[in-house]
């Protein structure tokens, strides 16, 4: 019975050791990220979120992408809610269809950070993004400057219904309205996509024999518009301006250096700032409800510097990823060593328990043997006395 109890104790100790070792690796917070689309700008933001997460302990980040599908994004958000995330980061595809599901999460007590695009409600915990209206105004002022207040302009907007598309257009129109010599000939919906923007540009080229400047609301659409104009041999007749200013092959900064774009405006991704605010919320620290990220123009004067700085940052990011990978390996090795250590301690405790049990058993056996010997001796003495009495009687 005593050995049976010791076996139970041993298994309980082993389970305790494993539980302690594993519990130190479990995430304390789980953050769900719902991205509306998957492009270079979104990938950059995701990379920044994940990189910043390395600097916090016990955080797990689950990123899902809706690929420009409102229904899919609503489904993604509801799945994250059902899985019990502690905080949601949402970049809405379109404001109207996504607002209800964001409100649903907020009403259930889940903190929600809305990024990049806004919703049609104030039921969110924090917002992080650029001021798209101000970016549109900055583009308008730049256009007025390079055209010297005179010229014919076409605009290729982002997805109709998305707040950045609306705000960038309104800001642009506000700026150029101060210059009567600038005419906005037409606005076409490029849906943020390069191929669709190219198709819309084909239409614009057929409609308007003279265009001085093409304003595309992101660099991918600007590249699509440039390619369409190049097919018609008209790319030298007009200027092209985009928004995003990402570095890398075929991105905005490279397009400026190649002479395809005259300029691109920085649209900061801000993934690191989003993650910092998320951790402030989860740890009950003060945080700003509205964080507006700044912008600036990238043209031929500063594009090379921008490219070099981004390349240097990319190198540092790679080193951080390598270091984080090694840290994870060390932590995994440490956790394994913990399990082995706790298992060894449990085995040692069992061994000590068994030794104690053996010792106590031997003591009990020796005591029993002594008692039996004494009883045997008494019986022998009684037997001898009986024999002697019998002999006397005879």
Predicted regions and their residues:
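An alpha-beta-alpha
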Residues: 31, 35, 49, 138-180, ...
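Extracytoplasmic "Venus flytrap"
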Residues: 32-48, 52, 56, 62-72, ...
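Short, solvent-exposed amphipathic alpha-helices that sit
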Residues: 41-55, 59, 135-139, 163-182, ...
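Hydrophobic alpha-helical segments within soluble ligand-binding/sensing domains
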Residues: 73, 128-153, 196-198, 247-252, ...
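Hydrophobic alpha-helical
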Residues: 87-106, 172, 186, 190-250, ...
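Flexible loop/hinge segments that line or gate small-molecule binding clefts
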Residues: 95-134, 145, 152, 158, ...
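Hinge/cleft segment of the Venus flytrap/periplasmic-binding protein
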Residues: 160, 164, 176, 271-346
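Alpha-helical transmembrane signal-anchor helices
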Residues: 327-386
